[in-house]
Regions:
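Bacterial N-terminal signal peptides
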Residues: 10-25
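Extracytoplasmic metal-acquisition and chelation regions
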Residues: 28-309
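N-terminal secretory signal peptides that target proteins for export/translocation
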Residues: 1-8
Length: 309
């Protein structure tokens, strides 16, 4: 009987060998378009090698002020799942980007469109919408990623969504989500205990970016350097903040990695309080290389500035 041995297969012409290899089914990774680095990092935690994640912004960009460039439109066009913050954070660019992508899978209301803020309790929800108040979001403050408890809630919802859009690998996503949830909860307990000495501390913010962080750690925001949300600090308003702090001192002033540090540095010099750069998202500082590093770094910076030796 004439049988093909492995040696005989090796002797096949290269073109035939290539055709045989291409005929073997291969898993195509789920293509995920993440608006911000924190959601790209979370998707990677839950999806591993099952996902191919593309992130639209970096930690050094203001997520409010992104342009719907052709390169981003092309990435959205090929995506199986879009993972963004929602709560109007990307309202200035994401709707246009999705419309121009022509990708029916990722339009609002479809399983391929995931808004993280839909799954957490929003803070700073305005009683009435008045644009004279500045860049106010009707759905509430969108910077939900500064509280690790919110990350846990989003992870649970995102794990289910990954199972929905890629049911062939539902079991793998479920296992990854359960593993992440366990590790994340342990980390939250550790971070909360480490930050306990900061409870009740008075702080100043350059932008209303940290309300969820303050809610988690029981910090008290006593002033904001922006006169209105999204409006750059003015000299007169900075003087008003300085006068406020003379009557009721704060322990530190916080600004995000993507922001111009000069207003915070001015207050630091004139009020004699530390200016603390907060990563705000993955990649914002050297220590914030992933989600766990993001909160390791944030807590460490707050403690270094806010706890007297």
């Amino acid at each position: 009987m004439n049988r093909k041995t492995p040696h005989a297969l090796l002797a096949l012409p290269a073109g035939i060998m290539l055709a045989l290899l291409m005929a073997v089914p291969a898993h195509a990774a789920l293509r995920v378009f993440a608006c911000e680095p924190e959601w790209g990092a979370l998707t990677q935690e839950l999806g591993g090698t099952l996902v191919d994640v593309s992130v639209a912004t970096s930690a050094l960009q203001d997520p409010h002020q992104i342009q719907a460039k052709p390169s981003l439109i092309a990435r959205a066009r090929n995506a199986d799942l879009v993972v963004c913050t929602g709560a109007e954070l990307e309202i200035g660019w994401l709707p246009v980007l999705l419309q121009q992508s022509g990708n029916a899978r990722v339009q609002a209301g479809q399983p391929g469109n995931f808004a993280a803020a839909d799954f957490v309790r929003k803070l700073d929800v305005p009683g009435q919408l008045d644009r004279a108040q500045g860049d106010v979001h009707a759905a509430g403050n969108p910077h939900i990623q500064t509280d690790p408890r919110n990350i846990a809630l989003v992870a649970a919802a995102l794990g289910k969504r990954l199972q929905q859009v890629d049911p062939a690998h539902a079991a793998e996503y479920a296992r990854a989500q359960a593993d992440f949830a366990q590790r994340w909860q342990q980390a939250i307990v550790r971070w909360t205990a480490q930050a306990a000495p900061l409870k009740g501390a008075a702080v100043v913010s350059q932008h209303k970016a940290f309300v969820y962080l303050y809610d988690w750690l029981a910090l008290k925001e006593v002033a904001v350097l922006e006169p209105k949300p999204g409006v750059e600090p003015t000299a007169s308003h900075l003087q008003e903040v300085l006068a406020t702090l003379k009557a009721a001192p704060a322990r530190m002033v916080l600004y995000s990695a993507y922001q111009d540090p000069r207003p915070s540095e001015w207050l630091s010099k004139n009020a004699a309080i530390p200016a603390v750069k907060i990563a705000f998202t993955v990649g914002g500082t050297e220590g914030a290389k992933d989600l766990f590093g993001l909160f390791d770094d944030t807590v460490a910076r707050l403690l270094a500035a806010g706890v007297k030796p």
